[in-house]
């Protein structure tokens, strides 16, 4: 399936029109394709449309500290685009787009891995970037309680390096295995002159399914509910424009050791994004999960409020989880304010679940040795996210 058709699945499922492959793209090699020749549903109604951004709204810049804006990310332009799209596609804002199908919803999400790709080019680490690609979409759709069904990818480059492309696809296959979903198809586009030598771009689309009476939507969240955090592997796939700016300013190279650890900066920054699908679906099956947020672009500040109804806020307990060394280094080397860190990075928590107090006790008491769950906060009356 072409990228345009995949994006339509995620963003405009409601059109109830056939999704068609892009047959007019020059110098394009279709790896595999899927053609949907008729609408998936019957009523053409849209429940939710997803439009995710890798950027977040940033407050006033610190006088000396670096910000996402300093790194070249125009937050205001991104917010303005979302506002304009909202006029054409009411209902945007969820982590995944929902399309009714009988007694279930198809849930779709599409994403890329941002400028983490530039570190892949520099380090030569191409075999895990595909895991990042899958993770960004499947982690989004599982926030609705959806089980991923299939994934499609788009690989674009100026000149096809078969060995590199094979490594990338291997990572995508690994990510799909971790998600219990199928790599159903994709597109490989070779477009001379559009990319620099040795560079490529990636994007992907995941589609899952959830019963209508099992959708996780946050509507039942109340003050006093508990926020459980699932640890990240590091930076994951967001904020790399700022990461690269800090790296350049620090005078260190990717081969240097990460301060405060026994691994290199390359190893820390290229650690693949955690895929939370199996873990989250298992927790959902045991009951008490009311809302889920994937902590991506926008960090804690912008993502957590997407989960609960108006009139409620989140109180996050400072020091309630272990912040990885890579974030401590980024903040110190870039002189980044606390508020900027929280709006840009996951700070060591890649997924949060809002659960009832009873479910929280069960989750924390019965976790296995391999499980790391943190009670990181609670739901309170108010708005936004407060740290204390």
From Swiss-Prot:
Pfam families: AIRS, AIRS_C
EC number assigned by the record: 6.3.3.1
Record NCBIfam families: purM (TIGR00878)
Top-level taxon of origin: Eukaryota
GO biological process: 'de novo' IMP biosynthetic process; adenine biosynthetic process
Name of this protein: Phosphoribosylformylglycinamidine cyclo-ligase, chloroplastic/mitochondrial
Catalytic activity field: 2-formamido-N(1)-(5-O-phospho-beta-D-ribosyl)acetamidine + ATP = 5-amino-1-(5-phospho-beta-D-ribosyl)imidazole + ADP + phosphate + H(+)
Subcellular compartments: Plastid, Chloroplast; Mitochondrion
Record keywords: ATP-binding, Chloroplast, Ligase, Mitochondrion, Nucleotide-binding, Plastid, Purine biosynthesis, Transit peptide
Family stated for the protein in its record: Belongs to the AIR synthase family.
One of the record's GO molecular function terms: phosphoribosylamine-glycine ligase activity
Class of enzymatic activity (EC top level): ligase
Pathway: Purine metabolism; IMP biosynthesis via de novo pathway; 5-amino-1-(5-phospho-D-ribosyl)imidazole from N(2)-formyl-N(1)-(5-phospho-D-ribosyl)glycinamide: step 2/2
HAMAP family xrefs: AIRS (MF_00741)
Keyword Chloroplast: yes
GO CC terms in record: chloroplast; cytosol; mitochondrion
């Amino acid at each position: 399936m072409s990228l345009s058709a995949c994006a339509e699945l995620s963003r405009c499922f409601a059109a109830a029109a056939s999704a068609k492959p892009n047959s007019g793209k020059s110098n394009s090699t279709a790896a595999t394709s899927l053609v949907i020749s008729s609408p998936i549903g019957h009523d053409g109604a849209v429940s939710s449309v997803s439009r995710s951004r890798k950027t977040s709204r940033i407050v006033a810049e610190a006088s000396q500290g670096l910000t996402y804006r300093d790194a070249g990310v125009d937050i205001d332009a991104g917010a303005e685009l979302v506002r304009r799209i909202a006029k054409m596609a009411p209902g945007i804002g969820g982590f995944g787009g929902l399309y009714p199908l009988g007694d279930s919803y198809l849930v779709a999400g599409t994403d890329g891995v941002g400028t983490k790709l530039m570190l892949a080019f520099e380090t030569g680490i191409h075999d895990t970037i595909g895991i990042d690609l899958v993770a960004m979409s499947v982690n989004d759709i599982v926030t609705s309680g959806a089980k991923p069904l299939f994934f499609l990818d788009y690989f674009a480059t100026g000149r096809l390096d078969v060995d590199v492309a094979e490594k990338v696809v291997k990572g995508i296959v690994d990510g799909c295995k971790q998600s219990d979903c199928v790599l159903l198809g994709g597109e490989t586009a070779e477009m001379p002159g559009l990319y620099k030598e040795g560079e490529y771009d990636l994007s992907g689309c995941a589609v899952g399914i959830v019963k209508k009476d099992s959708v996780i939507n946050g509507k039942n969240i109340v003050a006093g509910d508990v926020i459980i955090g699932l640890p990240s592997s590091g930076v994951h796939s967001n904020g790399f424009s700022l990461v690269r700016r800090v790296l350049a300013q620090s005078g260190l190279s990717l081969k240097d050791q990460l301060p405060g650890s026994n691994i290199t900066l390359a190893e820390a920054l290229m650690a693949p994004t955690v895929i939370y699908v199996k873990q989250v679906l298992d927790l959902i099956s045991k009951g008490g999960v009311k809302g889920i947020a994937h902590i991506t672009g926008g960090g804690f500040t912008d993502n957590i409020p997407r989960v609960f109804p108006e009139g409620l806020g989140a109180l996050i307990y400072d020091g309630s989880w272990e912040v990885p060394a890579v974030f401590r280094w980024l903040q110190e080397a870039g002189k980044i304010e606390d508020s900027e860190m929280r709006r840009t990075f996951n700070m060591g928590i890649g997924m949060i679940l809002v659960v009832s107090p009873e479910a929280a006790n069960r989750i924390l008491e019965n976790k296995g040795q391999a499980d790391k769950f943190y009670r990181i906060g609670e739901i309170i009356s108010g708005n936004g996210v407060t740290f204390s």
